[in-house]
Swiss-Prot record:
Coiled coil: none annotated. One of its GO terms (molecular function) is mismatched DNA binding. This protein is involved in the repair of mismatches in DNA. It is possible that it carries out the mismatch recognition step. This protein has a weak ATPase activity. Keywords: ATP-binding, DNA damage, DNA repair, DNA-binding, Nucleotide-binding. GO terms for biological process: mismatch repair. It comes from Pseudomonas aeruginosa (strain LESB58). InterPro entries: DNA_mismatch_repair_MutS (IPR005748), DNA_mismatch_repair_MutS-lik_N (IPR007695), DNA_mismatch_repair_MutS/MSH (IPR017261), DNA_mismatch_repair_MutS_C (IPR000432), DNA_mismatch_repair_MutS_clamp (IPR007861), DNA_mismatch_repair_MutS_core (IPR007696), DNA_mismatch_repair_MutS_N (IPR016151), DNA_mismatch_repair_MutS_sf (IPR036187). Signal peptide: none annotated. CDD domains: ABC_MutS1. This is DNA mismatch repair protein MutS. It holds the Pfam family MutS_II. ATP binds at G613, P614, N615, M616, G617, G618, K619, S620. Residues 796-816 are annotated as: Disordered. PROSITE patterns: DNA_MISMATCH_REPAIR_2.
Amino acid sequence: MTDLSQHTPMMQQYFKLKHQHPDQLMFYRMGDFYELFYEDAKKAAKLLDITLTARGQSGGKAIPMAGIPFHSAEGYLAKLVKLGESVAICEQIGDPATSKGPVERQVVRIITPGTVSDEALLDERRDNLLAAILGDERLFGLAVLDITSGRFSVQEIKGWETLLAELERLNPAELLIPDDWPQGLPSEKRRGVRRRAPWDFDRDSAHKSLCQQFGTQDLKGFGCQNLTLAIGAAGCLLAYAKETQRTALPHLRSLRHDRLDDTVILDGASRRNLELDINLSGGRENTLQSVVDRCQTAMASRLMSRWLNRPLRDRAVLEARQESIACLLERYRFENLQPQLKEIGDLERILARIGLRNARPRDLARLRDALAALPDLQNAMTELEAPHLQALATTIGTYPELAELLAKAIIDNPPAVIRDGGVIKTGYDAELDELQALSENAGQFLMDLEAREKARTGLPNLKVGYNRIHGYFIELPRVQAEQAPADYIRRQTLKGAERFITPELKAFEDKALSAQSRALAREKALYEELLERLIGHLAPLQDSASALAELDVLANLAERALNLDLNRPRFVEHTCLHIEQGRHPVVEQVLETPFVANDLALDADTRMLVITGPNMGGKSTYMRQTALIVLLAHIGSFVPAARCELSLVDRIFTRIGSSDDLAGGRSTFMVEMSETANILHNATDKSLVLMDEVGRGTSTFDGLSLAWAAAEDLARTRAFTLFATHYFELTVLPESQPAVANVHLNATEHNERIVFLHHVLPGPASQSYGLAVAQLAGVPAPVIQRAREHLKRLETTSLPHEMPSQQSGKPASPMQSDLFASLPHPVIDELSRINPDDISPRQALDLLYAWKMRV
């Protein structure tokens, strides 16, 4: 620590506080500014684009400093939090008038990316999560806390790949890991990683603190008593939250045990490729959520995002949601509910801020309005007969006493903060009313005093006024100042005037200013009492908020089903995926022409479709729409199809698109193969797999070989697979793999221009139309002509693989050249190595039968 003896008393105070918070920027309150000093000032000046100055000296050197106005701090804090910085807020808690030496200060709150709760610093439509992990390469405990809602969950996960996929799903703003973990682990590549002391993860201490937080003897009731690694991580989260918030956390009431087995697992690549809530450019436009989310409240939008990113495998829950949506669609009942739900607002985060004791007056006004809307909403729900909706209605209370309390206590349109008062209604508290009357009557007193003094002194330019620095005063022009009566005491000299005070005015000033400060203190005390009373009702209010958010999502899905022509899917026990007239929900919305719907049929007999056809023909759209239909079914939503029948899936994999990983030192092909390896290792017979153009990132023979082998492996796994390819050789797979079938996206050429028809038809494509697509893209005509010459030569020098004709009696169109045609057949290769004199007649017959099966 710096030698403090060489520094001024104020800087000594600063260094003592800064020493306790070395990793955070310190906002040090000085009057109407937050000041930053030394390295904090340099860093903040760079990040916030504010002026770096050097004022005064301490320890014999100029002090680098930067400041931001107290009243506009929120905007600067929001920017720092988005940049991943943490800030310690150091306030003046002493009275400057009575302080000897520097005003007493202390850190009242630490704002970090994962524990921020201020409305202005949060994205209202995204969860803001704090996570912690503990474990080794084989087993990890993961704890996740949303301090803005009170959701607190734990789970144990096997293996790095699964852990990283879960972290990608959650996308925590901050991630806590033990300080004794080795450097360079995969988790450290994430943003917002903070290393914490190993003892912060101690399991025994964690168990004790969690039981104390929830008021229980053990954690058995939460189903996580034996999750020792996850409990250690949860204990670290709880301690970190308390350390940063500097208050109790009454809104953290329980711990949920999440299980991966209950969900449809999507890895990071699949989540990105399907563009669930973030598009490939990092924005939110043209994502699945942008189409299916018309929720009335922000808390419902966040719930919708959680549903989309964590589809369920619990058929009972999914069918209960479907039944609820169907009920809300009857007689358009959702239309009555949605305007009332809009009045509820973001109840979830308002209640969290009340629990954290940093709720603002407008939070209480919004809570008042939400509680006032609940009785009408309850009445509207009485006609909903779906069991799940009835359960939600039972959970949603009305709280008439709290509604009345807030209606009496808070003015209609309160100010943003309690700091200057003006929040509590007249008539709520007699003592406050009396003090405010005394303060507010000052204006009339001053007018009367001014009239009397003008009459007494005969000075018509005399004025009586007030300012915050010098208090009350009588002002005379400089030329009349000499005529002031003897009882006028000089208070302030201005350029053209003199200000005075009289004993009468001084007595009034003492009384009025005392009343003003006492009124403000009383109002703040009443506000704190209100928060405490509300905290006593947090548990049922939070349960109501959760039920209201789910009701909002279900009403939204009913509205979307009506306006997007979505239909109810049917889950079945036997393995199948049948879709009639399926559509891509996002592409359909952006097309100016009608979307071409297509069917899909996978079942016990057909597990894989090899999809061929031209680029831009719709292969990727067809594959993605299948995955999105399956995913929507697994959140309980209706789906964009005329009819859908499916069994539950355990995972959705996608290997679509190509991009390199420059930061990780991986080429496009390496990324492609890594994703392919993950699929081949983890796909099961209950998985849905989308494979698009596997092998295109390397040489033709290597790529074709890899694609062929991968397709064979998936066929043996019996995963539901859509395998799009330009390797026409793969269309012979059905001959050796009975569960594989061919389909193609059709197109035609007209006047040497390609026309995409987008229909999915049985059988392989007749040609790829690659040159036509190149021409459409604007490749120069001489290049296209030269390519035609090369293509003609290649087609005549390579033997095409014999394929069945397209229609009975008509020869097939010329196929793409079989690049394997020039390779020796494996049977021929084996035959060339056999010496007939070395084998018996029986061995020769066995070989003959084996070769017969393979040819």
